[in-house]
């Protein structure tokens, strides 16, 4: 089973909020806490949305190819929640989609889709997508049209594409292909 909690980040009483979340997690016998978020980045909208993940759990680091959580600085409720999870020995992962900063107004269905696909990998479950794939395509087409109308933005997007294409090789490892095929088979059983 999956328990979803959606809401606005609280402005105060973070410790109380965290206690309530962890109390609910204990009551429901949650085996892992996964938080999702988005951050503005210099990613072009024309490429797959990068999803990064972090954890302080050494086992999860290796299992899901995540980064060690080593951030120091101002934090939000996600940082407080993950620190509490670590204290109470509840495995936790934080996943973040990189949204192009030049179209940072929510919603961003393409980023949502990228996060859902990562959740499928982490939890090893198929997630019904409904209209999300079509919404992500429509979002990208809409941003394409906006960029075409402004030559300065179009040039900027091309620069971002070139930078991204030269720094990242396409993911075509055997493991990535197998993971995508497994996702396809699971989705066929859900749809």
Identify the meaning behind each predicted range.
Residues 37:
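Acidic-aromatic/histidine active-site loop/patch
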Residues 1-32, 40-191:
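Accessory terminal and edge-of-domain segments that mediate assembly/interaction
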